[in-house]
Regions:
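Short, small/acidic-rich helices and loops at N termini and domain boundaries
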Residues: 1-60, 84, 95, 114, ...
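Pre-Walker A adenine-sensing motif
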Residues: 71-80
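Cytosolic-facing regulatory segments adjacent to core modules
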Residues: 76, 107, 111-194, 208, ...
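P-loop NTPase nucleotide-binding module
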Residues: 79-124, 177-190, 196-199, 210, ...
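C-terminal regions of RecA-like/P-loop NTPase motor modules
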Residues: 180-195, 224-234, 245-330
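Structural recognition of the conserved hydrophobic beta-strand(s) that form the central parallel beta-sheet
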Residues: 199, 236-241
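Walker B catalytic acidic pair
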Residues: 202
Length: 330
């Protein structure tokens, strides 16, 4: 039956080759895993699986049931990064979107030892690794750019580099990668060595199928495909997104859902929508210097609200904030 379906697909001339190849690849992977694609499942089995998940969570005796981010308050609100979730992270330029997800990747890959794939469409893999050097070794990022390091900093750099080199981190910096190519690579990673987390920097730089009538529709198609990928591989997918300039016209410049650029169906597809905001970027006299707000504007299966993190610009690093510096939520 599968061979007949594949043969029929090959004779279609009204569909992009990449879409046909994607369906064929997915069918073969399902066959290798001895399962059907989209089969009905008796409710009894679903109930048993759900009860097993709850029992497993109870045995952990903690609030984090997913993959920890390393940020205590954020993990408490989200219970970690949950399998099959599409997590959208958005902010205006210079708020630290890339730095934030690299902090998460650092914790997940280096300290949780979980395989993490980063698709970097804006920065080269060498630039990302330099940022990771600064994060892990705590050496000033500017010193890494100039090479003006003291002896103890060289030692810390080497120690950090060894940790990074031995980690299960994968970086792909293909410019303008298409969703079909990304999906194919992720399936291969998952099949060959396992895959626990996917990070995309950033959504609007991805290429679509070319079938969409507008860029907004194309971005919506990409976000829908990313949600499908998260479900298929049962891993969290973090996608970075731009915000439109509307936020700059308001007195309160904290982002809102309506600020998502090329939004279309992005906010509907995402299980979690988060924004980054730093008051000291706009208000130089604020008493909240180097404090970032992580605003959870949407969480399909959990609470919304704001957590605060310390911002260490010399390392492009976020950190947990001491309780004495936190602002109580309304």
């Amino acid at each position: 039956r599968m061979s007949q379906s594949i043969e029929n697909d090959c004779y279609k001339d009204d569909e992009p080759v990449s879409d046909v190849m994607d369906r064929i690849e997915k069918a073969f992977l399902a066959l290798l895993q001895n399962r059907g694609v989209g089969d009905f499942v008796p409710i009894r089995q679903v109930v048993l699986n759900a009860l097993e998940n709850i029992a497993s969570a109870a045995k952990m005796q903690g609030s984090v049931t997913g993959i920890p981010t390393g940020f205590t308050d954020l993990d408490y609100k989200m219970a970690g990064l949950q399998p099959s979730d599409l997590i959208l992270l958005a902010a205006r330029p210079s708020m630290g979107k890339t730095a934030f997800v690299l902090n998460i990747a650092q914790h997940v890959a280096f300290h949780e030892n979980k395989c993490t794939a980063i698709f970097s469409l804006e920065m080269s893999k060498e630039q990302l690794v330099n940022r990771l050097f600064s994060l892990e070794s705590r050496v000033d990022a500017q010193k890494l750019r100039t090479g003006n390091l003291q002896d103890f900093e060289w030692q810390e750099l080497v120690e950090g580099a060894n940790i990074i080199a031995g980690s299960p981190l994968i970086i792909d910096d293909t410019p303008g990668i298409s969703i079909s190519e990304m999906r194919s690579k992720c399936r291969k990673f998952k099949q060959e060595q396992g895959l626990d987390l996917i990070i995309i920097d950033y959504l609007q730089l991805m290429s679509g199928s070319g079938k969409s009538v507008s860029r907004q529709q194309e971005v919506s198609d990409i976000s829908r495909a990313l949600k499908g990928l998260a479900r298929e591989l049962n891993v969290p997918v973090i996608a970075l997104s731009q915000l439109n300039r509307g936020v700059e016209q308001r007195d309160d410049k904290r982002p809102m859902m309506s600020d998502l650029r090329d939004s279309g169906a992005i906010e509907q597809d995402a299980d979690v929508v988060m924004f980054i905001y730093r008051d000291d970027y706009y208000n130089k006299d604020t008493d909240r210097k180097n404090i970032s707000e992580i605003i959870i504007a949407k969480q399909r299966n959990g609470p919304v609200g704001t957590t605060e993190l310390a911002w260490l610009p010399q390392y492009t690093k976020f950190g947990n904030l001491e309780k004495s510096h936190r602002r109580e939520e309304e």
